[in-house]
Amino acid sequence: MKLNDRYIKATLAGIPYLLPYGQLIADPAPATRLNDSGALLWDGILEGDSREELLALLADRYHATERERAALAEDVDQYLHSLCRMGILLADTPESRGDDTPPLFYRIGPLVFSYRGPSLLYDRFFSAFSCEEEDFDQEVLILTGKPASIPYGAVLIHTEELTICDSGSSYCFFFAAPWGIREMHVKKDGSRAVLYRMPDPDDMHIEDLFHALRFAFLILTQQKELYVLHSASFLYRGRAFLVSGSSGTGKSTHSALWHDLYQTPLLNGDLNLLGIRDSIPYAYGLPWCGTSGICTPKDYPLGGIIFLKQAAIDQVQSLQPDEKVLHILQRMISPAWTKELLLRNLHFSEALAPLIFSCRLYCTKEPSAA
């Protein structure tokens, strides 16, 4: 049993009450008057007592006989049920209970995911990455409704569409209404992500759910020393080459030039997962690919990164060692919400930069740019 920590027990004119505070005032949640038995049981719950221990408390208080213990057991169950119904006791919440349907599994790079949620989302976005059941790195659970408790913590990021909070052991994501998502809780080690969506019988927000899960993915991959770079990619001579630049620079256009001129397969139109394995850098396929629709579940050794700049003429410029590190760091979308997370990104950038070719390419949209 877990208590909603936004309630305190206080005595009003000699009568014990449970009083809500914080966000529960705004929701609003009612104050609850306790009788003697309720106050005793509340104190036991605060001590972490089990149902059997709570029953023993009452039996000792009232010197109950064996026959009376049966009636007291019903009282304890009714009391616990009432606290759960009011959101004061978080005993059997959807988050802790999970979903009864068998999970589906998918693999992205070296990581395996257990998924319970809308089948349409899995079929549309993860089926190409499906795998057999095995030990998983992240459990993904999508539920309809509100969480039993409201997490609190320091605000890390706030925009019109999204607020990210640090609630201690988890990151909490609060989305704008158009997403069709109430919130998402992701453990800091990335091992579990629970997304609470609004009722959506027509699955109009399936794509929003998919994009929201990317945040949970980024948390896990960073913990596993894998990082995501905003870039398009193509395959050339058995290696993945990335084209990176700010939105609208022409990443997809430049990759398409290589495809048209040299028949290089396109790997992803927007994002690439990078890691270093046995001192060799790799690019791993991702299902997230922007609006391009171009993605692959395969992974390849990483050949290099081209940092794109629009220009009137085509020109290649070499980069100094510090510029290589900075360019990689600035194109990452892996979390940098805290100093520690930023340093993780920096350390990877420093490790990756000397292992690959990279340059700045000033270019036009003409075939000569490739």
Predicted regions and their residues:
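Conserved glycine(s) of the Walker
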Residues: 249-251
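Hydrophobic positions on the alpha1 helix immediately C-terminal to the Walker A/P-loop
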Residues: 254
